[in-house]
């Protein structure tokens, strides 16, 4: 099967049949509990990274990167203890991802604060660099850009997507495609979304589609066509519009 056919098959089978159906069901309230949602996908999913690469025996076909909001060792162990209690036993019932063959831990302080925030933490998770609280995709000098693993994947010919339960220009998802000295620069972050050129974005809209500093500037919705993107609102609209567009 050709690479293009593999990509088409993946988009159809995964995005349409699994992820997006679950994604929209959760926010419509059809999945009522966080626990129920986690069993099918992840607890409090904020971000997801998907990369499709040319396949060979030494290379992963898909890569998923999940970030749970504020989720650390205590939250994971607490959940496992809770699941154990539900089964009436002493000890834990392991979660799926804690059984993976490899695991590690990371420090959580930022470059300037003992307690990080979503922007600095997102930048560290995306790029491997600590930065100042509030900064996205730049070092603590607020000028030097750093690039995410998603950008590296895109540069190597992979297809990349970002999905979040918050707005697409929020700090954590933005850390994978944007460069901003302040996380509140939502319009500029939205422009970076287009300019980075990933293949798929999903979230709860833009926080600031219009540039408050320059009302004459094009709003972010109108830029979609210019950059070759199609905007879909809701699962049914996505199904209607996803047959032809590539982004």
Each predicted region: which residue ranges?
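Bacterial Sec-dependent N-terminal signal peptides
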Residues: 8-10, 14-15, 19-58
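N-terminal catalytic scaffold of extracellular/periplasmic and nuclease hydrolases
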Residues: 58-246
């Amino acid at each position: 099967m050709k690479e293009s056919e593999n990509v088409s098959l993946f988009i159809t089978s995964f995005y349409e049949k699994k992820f997006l159906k679950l994604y929209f069901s959760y926010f419509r309230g059809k999945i009522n509990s966080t626990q129920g949602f986690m069993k099918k996908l992840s607890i409090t999913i904020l971000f997801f990274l998907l990369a499709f690469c040319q396949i060979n025996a030494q290379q992963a076909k898909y890569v998923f990167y999940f970030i749970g909001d504020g989720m650390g060792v205590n939250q994971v162990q607490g959940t496992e203890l809770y699941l154990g209690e539900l089964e009436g036993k002493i000890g834990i019932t392991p979660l799926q991802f804690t059984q993976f063959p490899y695991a590690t831990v990371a420090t959580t302080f930022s470059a300037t604060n003992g307690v990080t925030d979503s922007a600095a933490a997102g930048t560290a998770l995306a790029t491997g660099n600590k930065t100042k609280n509030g900064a996205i995709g730049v070092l603590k000098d607020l000028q030097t850009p750093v690039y995410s693993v998603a950008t590296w994947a895109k540069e190597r010919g992979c297809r990349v997507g970002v999905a979040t339960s918050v707005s697409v220009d929020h700090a954590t998802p933005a850390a994978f495609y944007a460069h901003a000295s302040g996380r509140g620069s939502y319009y500029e972050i939205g422009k970076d979304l287009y300019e980075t050129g990933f293949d798929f974005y999903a979230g709860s809209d833009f926080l600031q589609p219009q540039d408050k500093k320059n009302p004459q500037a094009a709003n972010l919705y109108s830029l979609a066509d210019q950059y070759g993107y199609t905007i879909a609102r809701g699962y049914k609209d996505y199904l209607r519009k996803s047959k032809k567009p590539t982004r």
